[in-house]
Amino acid sequence: MKRLTLLSLLLLFVYAAYSQHGPLQKNNIPLFGAQIFIEPGQSPELIDSWFQTLHDNGMNACRIRMFESYMLQADGTWDFTLFDYAFHAATRHNIKIYATFFPATEKTDIGGWKFPVDEAQKDKFARFIQALVTHYKDSPALYGWVLINEPGIDALPDTPFIRDSYADWKQENPSKEYKSNGYPVLMDTQKQKFQTDINTSFLRWIADEIRKYDTSHDVHVNNHAIFQNYGQYDFPAWRTFLTSLGGSAHAAWHFGYFDRQQYALAMLANAEIIRSGAGNLPWFMTELQGGNNTYSGLNAMCPTPEEIVQWLWITLGCESKGSIFWMLNPRSSGIEAGEWTMIDFQGKPTERLVAGKEVSQAVTANAALFREPHIIPSGIDVVYFNESLWAESLMAIKDDRYPGRQPGAVIKSPVACLRALTERGLNAGLKNINEYDFTQHDYSGKSIIIANQISIPAKYRESLETFVARGGTLLVEGLTAFFDEDLHNTMNTGFTFEKLFGGNISEFILKDNLFDVKANGHTLPTHLWYGHIAGQQDAVGVHTFGKGQVIWLPSTVALGAFVSGDYRPLSDYLVSVLPHSTSAISFDKHYSNMLMRTLKAGKETLVICINKSERQENVLLNNLPETKNRKIIYANTGCNITGDKLMMSPEGVLVVQL
């Protein structure tokens, strides 16, 4: 009897240790998994087989959409039986579950609602949160809660909840009729500001409701369509109620600004935005496209096994704690039925799942290396402003023949600069201006690029002046600061940045789809606009301010690279004029369609390189440390390292520990 009691206590201890996961930590080993789609009609045995498949293919996590519609009974109670099958199966196969709240909605609503219709629906959601959290919080399989599926929406719905919230918000944020200098305000971004704030406040409310009943598990959310929606996200504010940040990155839905060859670049930019947004929180890619499109997706595709591998390593190269694919098994009906999956209709693993397994195995075999690697900074950051996207949403012309006048130009420009630097092997950051640390006392050797950010509020003048005065280099490109926060052309009504930039614009001239601009001995392809700086003939103005300098190139050369596809001139120019780390590992020259991230893991250096070109590339590296302990972590056929040279096959990935 005593032996049984001791055994029972031991089992209880193991159960408790397993069930109390706590929030995701930055030093956790990365997780790999896939969404398991639960719906009526599935048997316990079928559900169990999917968790077995995950386990057998190197996966240790999954995400489940907790459909209230499949639980809610006529009397207002909830029957959790169907989802209990999944949690029991996850426990058996040692799979961690991220459970996504998906409150009752129309059966054709593929993504779920982002805001309640009214307070009554919000109250119902609160009761569902209570029921779901109290039912599953002690499950050993539960790892975390996803607040709601993919916050972010094209336009706010006209509902009582939104109308009432907007009325309250306007009391605290009244519109201006006139600026302080007497000019009228004819357009404003009040609705865009409100949408950002209501997103934050509603997500905070959900997190607070969860914490009433569960204070231990991870609280997470996944933004989506980042290149279109980033203006709706205030990541620094989200950090106050989340314990990890995530995102959805579906090439078919979200990468419409890019062609197929550029999807790896888009994934890198997406991951960098989330990494910066997470700050000190851990992050992982909550949804990563795993399978085929038949009738869903805006740009239908099926990822190749090579792309699956590339995307996983890209996110890991941006310090992610892993990725969860959308999805393992197919939904049976409606939009996306029979699509997106990592297994076939017979339940067998596809080549894509096997490819993911190989990456998972490589990480697991080198777990210590991937616990908490840190990107080795180049000293260069590309920053963007939400206000520029807000302005573009009001000014751009969707069907215009010129990309620079269409939606997307204000994010394509920063991404073009990111690509130009990445193709030199440099770790450039991509972050919101509010995520940059302006509290340092010395910015010598640091550079900020502001590329075609058409609206910059006056409140950022002091931070940017501080950065430059303390030794930083600021490169300003394109139509940056054309508008202020009130959509006033400040170059006409009093230029806020005249002291910092060292002048004002005489005029912007629309010249051609593509033309050349000469800058510091470089000939740069330029799209649409040439900016004349008042009082000078050169295309570039260089102004010393305090201990630093401002390089002002008011022509849209980043869009020129994006539109022409020729990034070498922009890359050569940026590297020649911007201070950056001279000791960091980098390429000896520009290599088109070559991506690299270098990280530090303790005393070890980790190099992740991806060749998206169509030919074999032999890449020479600068500043490679001398070591006899090189170890290949992962390599496609035709990829290797010899001396200071990387041999990279087309579509190949090479991961090396130095």
Feature map (PLM): residue ranges:
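The substrate-binding groove and active-site-proximal loops of carbohydrate-active enzymes
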Residues: 32-42, 67-80, 110-126, 151, ...
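Hydrophobic targeting/anchoring helices
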Residues: 220-222, 228-415, 506-509, 528-530, ...
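Polysaccharide-binding and catalytic clefts of secreted carbohydrate-active enzymes
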Residues: 116, 127-131, 135-269, 273
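A conserved amphipathic helix/loop scaffold
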Residues: 451-658
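A short, well-structured beta->alpha microelement
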Residues: 417-441
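Aromatic-lined substrate-binding rim segments of carbohydrate-active enzymes
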Residues: 47-120, 197-214, 455
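Short, acidic/polar
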Residues: 41-55, 125-132, 227-238, 304-312, ...
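N-terminal carbohydrate-binding accessory modules
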Residues: 19-61, 73, 88, 92, ...
